[in-house]
């Protein structure tokens, strides 16, 4: 599968859902898109607040469930870590909450 403007090729396989193989799957790509979008939204909000974003890193844990009617993504949990001396914990949490409502991928999943 080719991704992005540069045409990066990623090995793509059904096996990656259940085995430890060096390939990816749709669920991992969805999680990566959500995590990346959220980090970008949060960094932008930090800059808009007149602060220096520092480091913002987000990872996603995508839960895939098998139900009677097939597989479903039941939830995506984002874990964000950052380093910024300009923000209090309270300010960062408030901006992260706002990022949840401004990140386009978060909007998609909340609709």
What residue spans do the PLM features occupy?
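Extended beta-strand/beta-hairpin segments
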Residues: 1-32, 39-111
